């Protein structure tokens, strides 16, 4: 197969043509600053308002609860740092999970250096947060619970409704990093008692450099970026109107096609999983088998070093990942795989393949065929595999 096979949609996605078409006029025709008072800026102002409603409709929020940011990482930083500052008089204890994206984990570590205490709740072997451990960790000085909606590496969908109920029971604010789940799986902020939510444009076939923060009305949160009075004086900086239009259109399209795309992606994903587990020995599927993002498959192959596997896949024209795109340059094993109990030597042999509605069954079968040959080749060069085969017949 001569064309590129892109199976790293959890890292970033191709911008939909309809999204690009919606954005283009705001670069060259309707380029006015939406904060300006003259009529020329009105088209930009209306475009921002429309996108705000498009985002709000996806999660069952009010338009005035939607704030635009520079991306998912900014939204996560804002959620933790600004909340910590705003609620520090009540307490300085924050709860999160051991498998969060580094935008959360590194921010939590920064807060620890600035006088806050963070509890990292464990997960089970499938990456589901331990709800009893979460509730037991809540203290009188707990000000925030932050748990992701779905894991970016292993695809496990977390029980947001149950987490939200626990947070509500104890009067604690609940934030979720929904970068991987937003517009891919149904989320309703009221039903799930979500106080804050982070999302990103480039994970839903929208542009890079634009994110979203949902902040429920009544939540105290300080400004994170200071300057002008944009975003109801909570997030300064001239609006990125083309990006805002893009994320709004992408969200609208994603939700309109969610049911159809989910059905299609699950069919391909399950075919991929079944072939890999059946045809490649000493392989493990990581993440929950059913409560899983529709496009995610994550495996560990024993006696394999992940970087070599990715290089050989790349030579075959296949784009995959060993985990998060934000850490794929690291040789350290995934903190997510270690948290679900995998030993270092197995975690090193991980592969994440994430599909899209444009992925074909032919591409999946080609990928599995190439992967089988690559695994066989790499294992043939492994003294550990040779020793294992000799001892186990």
For each feature predicted by the language model, list its residue ranges:
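Pyridoxal 5′-phosphate
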Residues: 1-393
